[in-house]
Amino acid sequence: MENTQENPATPSAEDIGSEKQAAQGAAPAAEAADAALAEAQAKVAELQESFLRAKAETENVRRRAQDDVSKAHKFAIESFAEHLLPVLDSLEAAVSDTSGDIAKVREGVELTLRQLTSALEKGRVVAINPVGEKFDPHQHQAISMVPAEQEPNTVVTVLQKGYMIADRVLRPALVTVAQSK
């Protein structure tokens, strides 16, 4: 009996030809895939480098901003202190005065008070002196209520001035307020 079936393990000539053709067709595809992979890897490396540079730049900007804020806090009072130095000079001159002339001392104290008021205003510190104004619990602290001719809840007297810097109350004014009739 003769074996007419071909051995499946032995490839035929057609199979060998088609495998060579497939291998030859696969070679350009593999080369194209390798080129695409290399291009993608180069792009990834480029993007990683760009990311690291952007991250470093962001860190530098953040650090510079922190330094600027730190310097602003550190030297914010410098201008205010410069405006107070003439007041200090005037007070030292008053203390060292031995003339005993009360009128001269009073005049010096008034001048010093004007210098101090000017220095505070240059630092945007303004007095709250609300006589005759409506009572405002954000700016005033009522010490007492008194019978008065003014409209109820109106400031009658200021016992101690308050002070504001910009729109913030540093110290509320101590006031007496008109009582309801």
UniProtKB/Swiss-Prot annotation:
Biased composition (Polar residues): 1-10
PANTHER family with a match to the protein in the record: GRPE PROTEIN, GRPE PROTEIN HOMOLOG, MITOCHONDRIAL
GO biological process terms on file: protein folding
Principal location: cytoplasm
HAMAP family: GrpE
Superkingdom: Bacteria
MF terms (GO), sorted A to Z: adenyl-nucleotide exchange factor activity; protein homodimerization activity; protein-folding chaperone binding; unfolded protein binding
Disulfide links within the chain: none
Protein name as annotated: Protein GrpE
An annotated GO cellular component: cytosol
Keyword Cytoplasm: yes
Residue segments, region Disordered: 1-33
Cited function: Participates actively in the response to hyperosmotic and heat shock by preventing the aggregation of stress-denatured proteins, in association with DnaK and GrpE. It is the nucleotide exchange factor for DnaK and may function as a thermosensor. Unfolded proteins bind initially to DnaJ; upon interaction with the DnaJ-bound protein, DnaK hydrolyzes its bound ATP, resulting in the formation of a stable complex. GrpE releases ADP from DnaK; ATP binding to DnaK triggers the release of the substrate protein, thus completing the reaction cycle.
Compartments where found: Cytoplasm
Keyword Cytoplasm appears in the UniProt entry: yes
Family: Belongs to the GrpE family.
